[in-house]
Amino acid sequence: MFELNNFDALQIGLASPEKIREWSRGEVKKPETINYRTLKPERDGLFCERIFGPMKDWECHCGKYKRIRYKGIVCDRCGVEVTKAKVRRERMGHIELAAPVSHIWYFKGIPSRMGLILDMSPRALEKVLYFASYVVLDPKETPLLKKQLLNEKEYRESIDKYGDDSFVAAMGAEAVKTLLDEIDLEQSSIELKEELKTSTGQKKIRIIRRLEVVESFRKSGNRPDWMVIDVIPVIPPDLRPMVQLDGGRFATSDLNDLYRRVINRNNRLKKLLDLGAPDIIVRNEKRMLQEAVDALIDNGRRGRPVTGPGNRPLKSLSDMLKGKQGRFRQNLLGKRVDYSGRSVIVVGPELKMYQCGLPKEMALELFKPFVMKKLVQNGLAHNIKSAKRMVERVQPQVWDVLEEVISDHPVLLNRAPTLHRLGIQAFQPVLVEGRAIKLHPLVCTAYNADFDGDQMAVHVPLSVEAQAEARFLMLAAHNILKPSDGKPVSVPTQDMVLGSYYLTMDKDGVKGEGKVFSCPEEVLMAYQCKAVDIHAKIKVRLKKVIDGETIEGIIETTPGKIIFNESIPQDLGYIDRTIPENKLKLEVDFLVSKKTLGGIITKCYMKHGATKTSIMLDKIKAKGYHYSTIGAITISTSDMVVPESKRELLENTEKQVEKIQKMYRRGFISEEERYEKVIDLWTKTTEDVANALMESLDSFNPIYMMADSGARGSKSQIKQLAGMRGLMANPSGKILELPIKASFREGLDVLEYFISTHGARKGNADTALKTADSGYLTRRLVDVSQDVIVRQEDCGTEEGYEVSEIKEGNEVIEPLVERLSGRYPSEDIIHPTTGEVIVKRNTYMDEDIAQKVSDAGIKKVKIRSVFTCKSKHGVCARCYGMNMGTSQKIHIGEAVGIVAAQSIGEPGTQLTMRTFHTGGVAGADITQGLPRVEELFEARKPKGLAIVSEVSGTVKMEETKKKRTIIVVTDDGEEVSYDIPFGSRIKVKNGDIISAGDEITEGSINPHDILRIKGVDGVKNYLLSEVQKVYRLQGVDINDKHLEVVIRQMTRKIKIEDSGDTELLPGTMIDVFDFEEANREILEKGGEPAVGRIALLGITKAALATDSFLSAASFQETTRVLTDAAIKGKIDPLLGLKENVIIGKLIPAGTGMTRYRSIQINTDDENIEEDSMDSMEV
């Protein structure tokens, strides 16, 4: 039996008239919808019950048969089958057209498929279809040509000249249908291939296009004449509903209006034909019918759209699929789910890392069926119905049952926008009073949540499998690392950091300094009795049992550090425990800031795993809050101390500025230089004031503590509060030379305030724009890489990708260690001096090994990379390396494509929107930030192009009055010269040796040039390092492998240049692996292989070029994708995630992969692995 969800692929094609009649349950003959008096559908109308099924369950139209017992009977009076009303969602009808009409998608799309296959221009075709010209179908003996157009006058003249039956010419879709019918696809294909061999230029391009369409029809088994419609399918009435409003009026779907126009015109045409009306009237009616069908299929594609009341264009069938509100994105990819709720969030500092507070009433509603089942099980209710009543009346015993149900049932919390996979995590719910969800403070960073009114959604995983996945994979306590760079995401923030910082400070000359205590417990007692200050330097005798022997000794520390170290495992590697005198030292014996806390968490995670780390985090959280409260660290204006040296510094600078102005007035320096110098002076002064300020602040100054610990604020903010605000930019980004000399503490005057507002407003406008742009970039990234899944352990490739550190000038942007850790080398790494093998090929390198390689002085290493992975679909685990989110080796089934897209898209909002203005008249604006990332991923020609050397060789410079020229001399003496426009900065010097693809002037390079000069490896390298530069400059770390995944998708297609003996068409794009496959097959038969070269596609193009038409159609340009797919009879193999979500199957990643599908889960055993919650209750 065919199960609706049990198929492996999906094919799309053109529907033949026979097929449409086969789908249909009857012909719709009348434009009537519903009788407004009886509110019953009219017979043979658009809502007819005889065609589409009954309006009410088990009830025919006339009421002769009611109730389920007559199931399946067709009423003899009204002809309605007695069945469920749901069939009105699936039964189709049809309209028999009195004259054929063309399908607008195939006639009007770009390129016009109908025009290509007939070799007519779309313009000529339009004249024929809309009855403006005749087309010659059969010239017989006359000198006319086949497919020649004749207007009314020429047609009459030809008839007079050659006689009535001397030739055949016609107009309208009938004529086109006849022409399409006559096409012999096999013959056309052979002729076009012959022509292709001899043609060049524009003609060649046109032939390739035509050949593509002809081949599509030939291979798919679609017939060209099916592009002309004889029968129109009518979609089921419940998909185009009509409902009665309060006032007795009806609201209806636009489709009904469009269908009604088609039926009206069709019926009128039938009548005219029966009456034998004059040709001109019939012709006009046929044209109107053609236009009505066009509007139904795609309103507004040709001519003015048909409008409804209030001049609103009606929504046609195409509009139902298109865009954010269309079927694909609104209903198939974005479904609403049951068992969910949302509420405002408040902070829950008392929660454990894996808990969240769930409001009682919300929990009761969410877990209703579970509670009802439990009530019956516990004998508190006799049946489900009475249990339901108990829950709805909220009787007291319901709450105890709810507690029981909830105790081992995780829930998912989600905050929109979900920018990365940490935007949905699982928690163990704890019932709370009130109506707000309580959230653990440490997961706020991952959700990017704060408590100023944010809302979050709750979802309940229902099945046992879903609960298990939520508990073992999605529990917040297991998601401590960020998938984008493997650094911890649950780092304490704000108060917690401040409290930890305060605890680990020390101070001279406070109460109890120098005292000696017999044990840590005594220190705590002394502190609680206020006999010793928390920051006092004291000595304590410690005892420890190590390997069975007891060691004791005295260490110097503070009470605060003892308290802080209680919650830290004492073996994180901060202290070398092999040295005897270090054995008793406290692990964290330094001032703790946000940065060092991050380090402590990383070390703990690497050494002890997630469970222990989350326990440690909870302890740090509790201590941090407690001591930042006790420490009473708070801000007041008296903490903002204006440095005394400020006035003197300002006066000095003003004198120097005056000197510079004098020099300018005397003509010693240019306007440019004067501006540069003034800006430099003020920048330096601002710095000096800031430094003076930082020096003058006491280390116990609350504002200083907040900034220094990383809890809130930064040096630049303190500088503005108590130093001076400094230079400001105007909206276009130019720096004004009038600095703001005041600080906020002193107060700004009117002019200063006005200058400040400029920047502030631009910042706000920028942020709003950036969010939208960043979201759209993420969407495109997800679409291009969504089908990349780890599908095998090892693809067996011998190739590798050479990495070295990424530099910008002299500054290292990404060190080698970072590029190596978590990877496999593709060849043995040998120590350059000792010659020993440090790492064998295909051996996993962790951070320590990577550090070893780097320390050995090795600069370049060949590693296994996603770039060189040979897996046809997805990637293999070896080429991918480490899973950044768990710092383990990646598992098969991990959706690495989506993780990559999220990792690149999520920090998008942090990137700036700005364009830097470099000095100089012709100084090109260098794009940076988000626009630069977008430019790279879309493989666009960048603004501010650099000149690139096409050849390798030595640089020779020549300068004349008119122009500057750079000549590159190759090794065999050939010279290539480049003219340098004025205003561009040259990057090379005379006598430099450069290689092909190096830039001669500053600026960005067009990636397509790099592909041409340096090949595909060069362009991959360039894109990777350029994107990394943008992100690193903003302080965002993204692991290379995420960028590799996306860039690999951009370089997967080959453009065929010569087809050889293969079936491939020149000029078409084909997947690298399919190309190699086709060539392998031809070579085995002894034929000539195809020749092609790698094409670099931007992410939008690459996403549309995917094998899956469902994924492409749901992304962009829906109609174009579907038109193309239908002609080609494309088969969607359902390999990606999106297409499976669309048709409602499990996604082929994680436990949804086919290899896990057949696993049976036995649920009789109640304790699934001693519930992971208990193990965390340590």
Swiss-Prot record:
<dbReference type="InterPro" id="IPR007081">
    <property type="entry name" value="RNA_pol_Rpb1_5"/>
</dbReference>
<feature type="binding site">
    <location>
        <position position="869"/>
    </location>
    <ligand>
        <name>Zn(2+) 2</name>
    </ligand>
</feature>
<dbReference type="Pfam" id="PF04983">
    <property type="entry name" value="RNA_pol_Rpb1_3"/>
</dbReference>
<keyword id="KW-0808">Transferase</keyword>
<comment type="similarity">
    <text>Belongs to the RNA polymerase beta' chain family.</text>
</comment>
<dbReference type="GO" id="GO:0003899">
    <property type="term" value="F:DNA-directed RNA polymerase activity"/>
</dbReference>
<dbReference type="InterPro" id="IPR042102">
    <property type="entry name" value="RNA_pol_Rpb1_3_sf"/>
</dbReference>
<keyword id="KW-0862">Zinc</keyword>
<dbReference type="GO" id="GO:0008270">
    <property type="term" value="F:zinc ion binding"/>
</dbReference>
<feature type="binding site">
    <location>
        <position position="454"/>
    </location>
    <ligand>
        <name>Mg(2+)</name>
    </ligand>
</feature>
<feature type="binding site">
    <location>
        <position position="879"/>
    </location>
    <ligand>
        <name>Zn(2+) 2</name>
    </ligand>
</feature>
<protein>
    <recommendedName>
        <fullName>DNA-directed RNA polymerase subunit beta'</fullName>
        <ecNumber>2.7.7.6</ecNumber>
    </recommendedName>
</protein>
<dbReference type="GO" id="GO:0006351">
    <property type="term" value="P:DNA-templated transcription"/>
</dbReference>
<dbReference type="GO" id="GO:0003677">
    <property type="term" value="F:DNA binding"/>
</dbReference>
<comment type="function">
    <text>DNA-dependent RNA polymerase catalyzes the transcription of DNA into RNA using the four ribonucleoside triphosphates as substrates.</text>
</comment>
<dbReference type="InterPro" id="IPR007080">
    <property type="entry name" value="RNA_pol_Rpb1_1"/>
</dbReference>
<dbReference type="InterPro" id="IPR038120">
    <property type="entry name" value="Rpb1_funnel_sf"/>
</dbReference>
<feature type="binding site">
    <location>
        <position position="452"/>
    </location>
    <ligand>
        <name>Mg(2+)</name>
    </ligand>
</feature>
<feature type="binding site">
    <location>
        <position position="78"/>
    </location>
    <ligand>
        <name>Zn(2+) 1</name>
    </ligand>
</feature>
<feature type="binding site">
    <location>
        <position position="795"/>
    </location>
    <ligand>
        <name>Zn(2+) 2</name>
    </ligand>
</feature>
<feature type="binding site">
    <location>
        <position position="876"/>
    </location>
    <ligand>
        <name>Zn(2+) 2</name>
    </ligand>
</feature>
<dbReference type="InterPro" id="IPR007066">
    <property type="entry name" value="RNA_pol_Rpb1_3"/>
</dbReference>
<feature type="binding site">
    <location>
        <position position="60"/>
    </location>
    <ligand>
        <name>Zn(2+) 1</name>
    </ligand>
</feature>
<dbReference type="Pfam" id="PF00623">
    <property type="entry name" value="RNA_pol_Rpb1_2"/>
</dbReference>
<comment type="subunit">
    <text>The RNAP catalytic core consists of 2 alpha, 1 beta, 1 beta' and 1 omega subunit. When a sigma factor is associated with the core the holoenzyme is formed, which can initiate transcription.</text>
</comment>
<feature type="binding site">
    <location>
        <position position="62"/>
    </location>
    <ligand>
        <name>Zn(2+) 1</name>
    </ligand>
</feature>
<dbReference type="InterPro" id="IPR006592">
    <property type="entry name" value="RNA_pol_N"/>
</dbReference>
<dbReference type="Pfam" id="PF04998">
    <property type="entry name" value="RNA_pol_Rpb1_5"/>
</dbReference>
<feature type="binding site">
    <location>
        <position position="75"/>
    </location>
    <ligand>
        <name>Zn(2+) 1</name>
    </ligand>
</feature>
<keyword id="KW-0240">DNA-directed RNA polymerase</keyword>
<dbReference type="GO" id="GO:0000287">
    <property type="term" value="F:magnesium ion binding"/>
</dbReference>
<dbReference type="InterPro" id="IPR000722">
    <property type="entry name" value="RNA_pol_asu"/>
</dbReference>
<dbReference type="InterPro" id="IPR044893">
    <property type="entry name" value="RNA_pol_Rpb1_clamp_domain"/>
</dbReference>
<keyword id="KW-0460">Magnesium</keyword>
<dbReference type="Pfam" id="PF04997">
    <property type="entry name" value="RNA_pol_Rpb1_1"/>
</dbReference>
<dbReference type="InterPro" id="IPR045867">
    <property type="entry name" value="DNA-dir_RpoC_beta_prime"/>
</dbReference>
<dbReference type="InterPro" id="IPR007083">
    <property type="entry name" value="RNA_pol_Rpb1_4"/>
</dbReference>
<dbReference type="Pfam" id="PF05000">
    <property type="entry name" value="RNA_pol_Rpb1_4"/>
</dbReference>
<keyword id="KW-0804">Transcription</keyword>
<dbReference type="GO" id="GO:0000428">
    <property type="term" value="C:DNA-directed RNA polymerase complex"/>
</dbReference>
<feature type="binding site">
    <location>
        <position position="450"/>
    </location>
    <ligand>
        <name>Mg(2+)</name>
    </ligand>
</feature>
<dbReference type="InterPro" id="IPR012754">
    <property type="entry name" value="DNA-dir_RpoC_beta_prime_bact"/>
</dbReference>
